[in-house]
A protein has these predicted regions:
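Active-site-proximal specificity loops/subdomain of glycosyltransferases
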Residues: 41, 45-96
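Short glycine- and hydrophobic/aromatic-rich loop-to-beta-strand nucleating segment
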Residues: 135-143
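Short, acidic, metal-binding catalytic loop of nucleotide-sugar glycosyltransferases
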Residues: 25-35
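Catalytic core and acceptor-binding pocket of nucleotide-sugar-dependent glycosyltransferases
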Residues: 148-294, 298
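Short beta-strand/turn micro-motifs composed of small residues
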Residues: 11-13, 38-40, 106
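Boundary detector for helix-to-coil junctions that initiate low-complexity/charged tails
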Residues: 294-351
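N-proximal low-complexity "stem/linker" segments adjacent to membrane-targeting elements
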Residues: 1-23
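GT-A fold catalytic core of metal-dependent nucleotide-sugar glycosyltransferases
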Residues: 86-131
């Protein structure tokens, strides 16, 4: 039997769990060869899968544990600041991760598909880091990778960990940019759907200012293909997640690794959602049903208000201006990437 890379994904979460957290856990359960390590103060009743290891702890106790690893006072006043500490977990939580070949961090506003279908053994053999966003990243569990965040001349990690506010240290333009600059072997293919924030309908690539567009430097053709999809919804069925959309009047379906529903309110009624299959549509989880182009047009209409269009256009201008300044920086951005950004924002604004 082939040896599978052992994976442990860290998820600290303090406060009330999201209303659709049971569906997140269901999607974890259907990835039985991957473990999740959840640190939480929640007493909510949950059907915890065997591959989700729960450590009950308070936010103050978790902060104290992280502090033990640094000889300077860290600033961790609220759970959101944990985003900047994600790249440190291989170092700060090392005792909990010794059994894993790769460790990672994730968010819980996700529904996973079949991760092993996309993250093959060849991917793990050839890379030190898998994916490059805060909602899911995996790292080879070796000292030079676990302490990589301490070694960067581009970013003062002490300043990041000592300061309030968010630095996006876990992704772009934080350590992910450092990996790119240093030519470190990381796997950054667009195997997931990171939904655009602040847009009513589903668009599978997130377009915001501040560097989140960074991963799409890798595959401009793929991101361009995503932008042409309309009437998008998702079907989860027995561990498989499919993106469904309408193209030239026809229903199209394609498997994806996971969908990230950042900053979206999603209604969820556990009494009507089967644990075997369900649909994810803008604003809700629904029971599964037979799909057609007409069904997608009904439940996932293309919708973008004028206020949203104006915001997207402003965000696009900000990012393009920032990227113009980056032309020529080592391993970062090219003129072709600038052109791709302009096309991205134009498409998302006037789609």
């Amino acid at each position: 039997m082939e040896h599978l890379t052992r994976i442990g994904i860290v998820l600290p979460y303090f406060g009330k769990l999201p209303n659709y957290f049971p569906l997140f856990l269901t999607s974890c359960r259907h990835n039985p060869t991957i473990n999740w390590l959840v640190y939480t103060d929640s007493d909510q009743e949950m059907d915890w899968p065997e591959n989700v290891k729960v450590t009950k702890t308070t936010f103050d106790a978790f902060r104290a544990r992280l502090q033990q690893n640094f000889d300077f006072p860290i600033c961790l006043d609220n759970p959101y600041k944990l985003c900047d500490f994600k790249p440190t977990y291989g170092d700060t939580l090392a005792e909990d991760l010794t059994q894993y070949d790769f460790w990672g961090h994730c968010d819980c506003d996700l529904v996973f598909g079949d991760l092993r279908h996309f993250l093959t053994e060849e991917v793990f053999q050839d890379h030190l880091r898998i994916l490059c966003c805060g909602h899911l990243s995996l790292y080879k569990n070796v000292p030079e990778v676990n302490r990589y965040y301490r070694t960067q001349p581009y970013i003062d990690y002490q300043n990041v960990l000592q300061s309030p506010g968010a630095f996006s240290f876990d992704e772009w333009p934080g350590l992910s940019e450092c990996w790119l600059r240093d030519g470190m072997p990381y796997y950054g293919k667009l195997i997931y759907d990171d939904l655009t924030v602040g847009v009513e309908d589903f668009r599978p690539i997130n377009i915001t200012p501040g560097g989140f567009i960074g991963p799409y430097h890798n595959e401009p053709d793929e991101s361009r293909r995503f932008r042409k999809m309309k009437n998008i919804l998702y079907r989860w069925n027995l561990g498989k997640l499919e993106r469904c959309w309408v193209e030239k009047g026809q229903l199209r379906q394609e498997e994806t690794a996971y969908v990230h529903m950042q900053k979206r309110k999603m209604s969820y009624d556990p009494d009507v959602i089967s644990g075997l299959s369900f649909l994810i549509v803008p604003g809700a989880f629904l029971p599964d049903r037979e799909l057609s182009a007409a069904v997608l047009q009904e439940f996932a209409p293309v919708s973008c208000s004028m206020a949203t269009r104006i915001r997207l256009l402003k965000d696009g201008i900000k990012v393009v201006l920032a990227e113009v300044k980056n032309i020529g920086r080592k391993g970062y951005c090219s003129r072709s990437a600038i052109v791709n950004h302009i096309k991205t924002y134009w498409s998302n604004t006037y789609k």
